[in-house]
Every structure is written in C-alpha cells, then in structure tokens.
C-alpha cells in the first residue's frame, strides 16, 4: 500500500509540496514557522552541505542590495529563526551573533552602480552568487528564496517561494542579510545626515523622499529608481 508523503519532481531536488507542509495540509492547517525539512530532504538524496540563500534591499532608493548564504550545523541551530520581517530587531541582532559563531556564513553585496547598470533583480542575483561563492565550505546544494535560480549558478539548487518562512537555512540567511544591511545603512546615515537611513534603511519613506527634494541625490542613491531619476531629470530640465 502506498503511503502518504512528499511527491518528488524531476530536475532539481525538490517537492511538489513542501515536505513539512503535506501533513499540515491533510488536517487543513498551515505551517507558520520554518523548519529543516528541505535541508533533510536534500541530505537524504546525497547532499552534504546545504546552503540557504536570501537577499535584502530590493526596494530601497539608496544603498546596495545584500545577500547572505548560510550552511547550518544540524546539531546546533539557534532557536527563534524565522523570516527576518517577523523577528524583532533585538532578536535579529542576537541571532546574527549566534549564526556568525555556529554556522558557515557568507555575506555579499551588489553596489548601487551595479543596480543601475543591470537592474535590481539581476543585481540581487549577483549578490547571491557572490555570497554562495564566499562560503568556507563548498555547498553541494542550494536553497534559494524566490522563484528564480540566479544566472551562472551551477550548483544543484531549488527555489522556494517564501523560503524565509519555510526553510531554516533561508530564514537564517534573511536575518544575516538584513542585520548586515541595516548596520551598513546606519553607518551611511552618519555620513549623510537628514535622509533617515538609520531608521528607514534607504526605503522610500516620507522622511527620505522629502530629504531627497531638499538635500538632493547622493552617490548612494539608485539613479535608475523612479523617485531618484525624476529628481535628477527635473533638475536637468531646470538647468536647460
């Protein structure tokens, strides 16, 4: 008799249904916290080092996009890992420190110039690949947040939509990337006061947009993003 279980799909190692979600679906419930099921499934198929990858910073008007890759130690996973947006700032900082001590962590960026030269999606993927390549151990399977495998990534991989809510490794990567980028924007805020980057991390808040109009565009602003582009274009028209 065939038993219940996750259904395998062809191509990259993966499942038609989240391997930890199928049981919840049978009882009409939804899993709300990430677990290690994707990682264990990959290991069961021969993977030895499974990395989770996520990026932070697609939406801001200023600053780089940052990515992190994390290989967790199955025997030493910090408690409280979740989507970085669901974890408070103090808890994120504590988890960041724990992960840096107990996991293989790599952090990378794609610059504002790269964002403007390519586009934010391509720049995000560039940062992801850099983070993967920066790991101390050679990951032989990658779990990627989202629905697209970055161009140039040759390691066997699996995309997971809302992966930071479903995979502990991706959740760890999301926390590392966010804490790293938030701290970077705090440093940049000291160099460029008035834009509120220490609190808005470069996102288009009312304070940030008003400061753009009053103080102008800095070298850290993304000129390809419409609010910044419009200010530059308006200034050019006024000078013509």
Which stretches of residues belong to each language-model region?
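RNase H-like, Mg2+-dependent phosphodiesterase core
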Residues: 2, 8, 14-240
């Amino acid at each position: 008799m065939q038993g219940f279980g996750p259904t395998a799909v062809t191509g990259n190692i993966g499942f038609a249904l989240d391997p930890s979600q199928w049981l919840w679906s049978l009882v009409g419930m939804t899993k709300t916290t990430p677990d290690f099921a994707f990682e264990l499934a990959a290991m069961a198929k021969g993977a030895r080092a499974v990395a989770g990858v996520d990026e932070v910073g697609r939406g801001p008007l200023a600053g780089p996009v940052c990515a992190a890759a994390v290989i967790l130690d199955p025997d030493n996973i910090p408690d409280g890992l979740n989507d970085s947006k669901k974890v408070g700032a103090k808890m994120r900082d504590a988890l960041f420190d724990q992960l840096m001590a107990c996991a293989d962590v790599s952090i990378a960026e794609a610059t504002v110039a790269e964002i403007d030269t390519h586009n934010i999606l391509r720049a995000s993927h560039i940062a992801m690949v850099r983070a993967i390549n920066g790991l101390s151990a050679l990951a032989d399977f990658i779990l990627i947040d989202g629905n697209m495998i970055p161009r140039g990534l040759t390691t066997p991989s699996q995309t997971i939509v809302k992966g930071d809510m479903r995979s502990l490794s991706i959740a760890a990567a999301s926390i590392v990337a966010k804490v790293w980028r938030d701290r970077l924007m705090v440093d940049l805020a000291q160099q460029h006061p008035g834009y509120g980057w220490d609190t808005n991390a470069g996102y288009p808040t009312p304070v940030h947009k008003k400061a753009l109009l009053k103080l102008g565009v800095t070298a850290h602003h993304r000129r390809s993003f419409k609010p910044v582009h419009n200010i530059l274009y308006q200034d050019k028209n006024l000078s013509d």
